[in-house]
């Protein structure tokens, strides 16, 4: 841990607090509709940020704080899964499939964009 700013657990916890608050703000700011757009936004943006940090070869402390901590708490593939099941339960299979594909393809495209911009 030579040169570390803080113990790894502290960096991850601080980043996690930041990411959780940011996710709450983004989801709260997203217009309420029948489609869970806030989940899509945080997953795509978080995937881009994590990929950019990775491709930029961020140092270990930066990755713990912003990668593992902030991006880990900001993104929410658990809520994404719950959203898909809720859409299926509401007899909206097309919306469920769109949400699933939107999150997965959006995250993948965000990673590709980060690679193009940073690598």
UniProtKB/Swiss-Prot annotation:
GO biological process, one term: fluoride transmembrane transport
Membrane-protein topology: Multi-pass membrane protein
Subcellular location, record wording: Cell membrane
Description of how activity is regulated: Na(+) is not transported, but it plays an essential structural role and its presence is essential for fluoride channel function.
Catalytic activity: fluoride(in) = fluoride(out)
Residues holding Na(+): 72, 75
MF GO annotations: fluoride channel activity; fluoride transmembrane transporter activity; metal ion binding
Signal sequence bounds: none
InterPro entries, sorted: FluC
Keywords from the UniProt entry: Cell membrane, Ion channel, Ion transport, Membrane, Metal-binding, Sodium, Transmembrane, Transmembrane helix, Transport
Spans through the membrane: 2-22, 37-57, 62-82, 99-119
GO cellular component, one term: plasma membrane
UniProt family annotation: Belongs to the fluoride channel Fluc/FEX (TC 1.A.43) family.
Role according to the record: Fluoride-specific ion channel. Important for reducing fluoride concentration in the cell, thus reducing its toxicity.
Protein name (record): Fluoride-specific ion channel FluC 1
Name of the gene this protein is made from: fluC1
